Amino acid sequence: MIWLTLVFASLLSVAGQLCQKQATCFVAINKRRKHIVLWLGLALACIGLAMMLWLLVLQNVPVGIAYPMLSLNFVWVTLAAVKLWHEPVSPRHWCGVAFIIGGIVILGSTV
């Protein structure tokens, strides 16, 4: 169950980062303020909830194992950037993502 909490904390953290990115997207001048307040408010909510879940994780998992698992954020953000904003990702970047996933699998299997 704690591993599910860790993944959910990671996803919420990423959601907060993505909301911040969305807040910077161009909108019409008459809608800009509402747009920014909405997305930054969602970002704060996601990041705040992620922090609360992270505290639960730290109570149950050694920090030397838990913290590297947050590198999952790089994987989630890359996938979201490609899907949501059609951002280009180089083969070198994908290689790095693969190494991160490999590292997470190795660390996770030691517990």
From Swiss-Prot:
Transmembrane segments: 36-56, 61-81, 88-108
GO molecular function: carbohydrate derivative transmembrane transporter activity
Cellular component GO terms, alphabetical: plasma membrane
Annotated membrane topology: Multi-pass membrane protein
Primary location: membrane
This protein's pathway: Bacterial outer membrane biogenesis; lipopolysaccharide biosynthesis
Name of a matching Pfam family: EamA
GO annotation terms (biological process): lipid A biosynthetic process; lipopolysaccharide biosynthetic process
Keyword line: Cell inner membrane, Cell membrane, Lipid A biosynthesis, Lipid biosynthesis, Lipid metabolism, Lipopolysaccharide biosynthesis, Membrane, Transmembrane, Transmembrane helix, Transport
Chain ranges of the EamA domain: 40-109
Protein's UniProt keywords contain Chaperone: no
Matching HAMAP family: Flippase_ArnE (MF_01869)
Function: Translocates 4-amino-4-deoxy-L-arabinose-phosphoundecaprenol (alpha-L-Ara4N-phosphoundecaprenol) from the cytoplasmic to the periplasmic side of the inner membrane.
NCBIfam families per record: PRK15051.1
Quaternary structure (record): Heterodimer of ArnE and ArnF.
Family per record: Belongs to the ArnE family.
Name assigned to this protein: Probable 4-amino-4-deoxy-L-arabinose-phosphoundecaprenol flippase subunit ArnE
Source organism (scientific name): Shigella flexneri serotype 5b (strain 8401)
